[in-house]
Design a protein with these regions (language model features):
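Non-heme di-metal
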Residues: 1-444
Length: 444
């Protein structure tokens, strides 16, 4: 009994800790977390004794990065060969799974680049220019067509997923880490450099995700952009090495040790392949119905009955949705493992003339579609090349900014969190670039 109580206390403590990180994320996003430094120290203690794949000698980092890029390229070629030989998609069995994943990682994507925000005040020091340029490129240099956060928001909006799902608190860990690092760069500069080093090395899952989203009719421009801009030859991955070389004191083992701790922060939370694999189609459909159930009670005529119970009675009790799905099948409203359009229930929820038009979101309808379809394989969605949706947008480049050096502190504040994706933040980014002279040159 004592052991059971102890386990219960520990379990509750873990729940409290994860609940806390979701609130912390929101506080950091608003710039109001007075205990972020202490929290970040706690996260660093969590990873301090973990293993990593960095070389003991920082002089070997260029070779390490080259080896990493070569391994990713090799593994991606192997993946493509498997697909050509008929292997199924590795990550996304259904489109619903892809939509679920995009919503699960939204808290991190909403603060893309935030860990580098604190470098902006060092614009007079050329050693910081690599980190600053990386941050500005994450912000699209203030161009709404190129701002990474806006690109992701547009993707979610196009897919009907902007409202978002109730998320496990652990989904906020990486976003909170990034925001905390960005707000406390002065104290945690080595850790910022290390985190940046790890985050900017293009992983295999990025390439596979880009490939499979396109197959499922989803514009993977956001992911393709990170494949190209983070490249190890001349992109953010290469720049992360140069920034470390320029900012690290000579032969300072403690500094490099802290860099490695920052690098390990990337491993907090669930890794991408494991997150994707945790998707449960029926579980997500049941969860969606349970959320809807509360609002659907007493909204149906008592003439609507399934296995002797009215729809209102089915919706009145928590935990009854699995039985509800079974009843829909038994009475012929749903034909599993078949074209969803052959199910009478589908005609109730899909199309402008449907009796339940608008009841289910685009994501929820995709859950229904893929659950009904089951093993049935239709033609599938038309492939969307990365950037196809973005190219069709009526967005234009904004005018170059104008600002004085005396205004830079105000501009930096307007670029914090994800405020840089708002019109005022986009303008502040352009003004910051104009005031500091940190333009990115191009061909003439």
């Amino acid at each position: 009994m004592v052991a059971m109580i102890r386990d219960g206390v520990r379990s509750q403590a873990r729940r409290d800790m994860t609940d806390e990180v979701a609130h912390r994320y929101q506080a950091l996003l608003a710039g109001r977390d007075a205990t972020a430094e202490d929290w970040l120290e706690t996260q660093l203690r969590r990873v301090r004794d973990r293993e990593d794949d960095l070389p003991e000698d920082p002089n070997l980092l260029p070779q390490w990065a080259e080896n990493h890029a070569a391994q990713v390229a090799h593994d991606h070629a192997h993946y493509l060969r498997q697909r050509r030989e008929g292997a199924p998609r590795r990550y996304f069995a259904t489109r619903a799974q892809a939509l679920w994943f995009l919503q699960q990682v939204a808290p991190t994507k909403a603060v893309d680049g935030a860990w580098l925000h604190g470098t902006l005040r060092h614009w007079r020091d050329p050693r910081y220019h690599g980190l600053i340029r990386t941050f500005l490129e994450e912000l699209g240099d203030g161009d709404p067509r190129c701002n990474h956060v806006l690109i992701y928001q547009r993707l979610l909006s196009r897919l009907g997923c902007l409202q978002g799902l109730p998320l496990e608190p652990s989904r906020f860990v990486q976003g909170a880490v990034q925001l905390a690092l960005g707000q406390h760069c002065e104290r945690f500069l080595p850790e910022v450099i290390g985190y940046n080093l790890g985050y900017e090395q293009p992983p295999l899952h990025l390439l596979i995700t880009t490939h499979e989203l396109a197959e499922l009719g989803i514009d993977a421009h956001y992911f393709q952009l990170h494949v190209t801009i983070d490249n190890a030859a001349s992109g953010h991955a290469r720049r992360s090495l140069e920034s470390l070389r320029m900012l690290a004191p000579v032969d300072d083992e403690d500094f490099y040790g802290r860099v490695r701790h920052g690098y390990r922060l990337n491993d907090l939370g669930l890794d991408t392949p494991s997150l994707i694999a945790s998707f449960d189609l029926q579980g997500e459909l049941l969860a969606a119905l349970e959320r809807k159930r509360v609002f659907g009670q007493f909204m149906h005529s008592d003439r609507c009955r399934l296995q002797g119970r009215t729809i209102n009675q089915w919706l009145a009790k928590s935990g009854a949705m699995a039985g509800f799905l079974e009843a829909l099948q038994v009475q012929g409203w749903i034909k599993r493992d078949s074209d969803p359009t052959q199910s009478r229930f589908w005609s109730l929820i899909d199309g402008p003339g449907a009796a339940m038009f608008g009841v289910f979101s685009a994501y929820e309808k995709q859950l229904w579609h893929d659950w009904i379809a089951g093993s049935w394989q239709g033609a599938g969605p038309r492939r969307v090349s990365p950037g196809q949706w973005e190219q069709a947008l009526a967005l234009q480049a904004e005018a170059p900014g104008r600002a004085q050096a005396s205004e830079i502190a105000t501009l930096i504040e307007a670029m914090a969190g994800n405020r840089h994706a708002e019109p005022a933040g986009l303008r502040a980014t352009r003004d910051y670039i104009a005031a500091t002279g940190l333009f990115q040159g191009g061909p003439r």
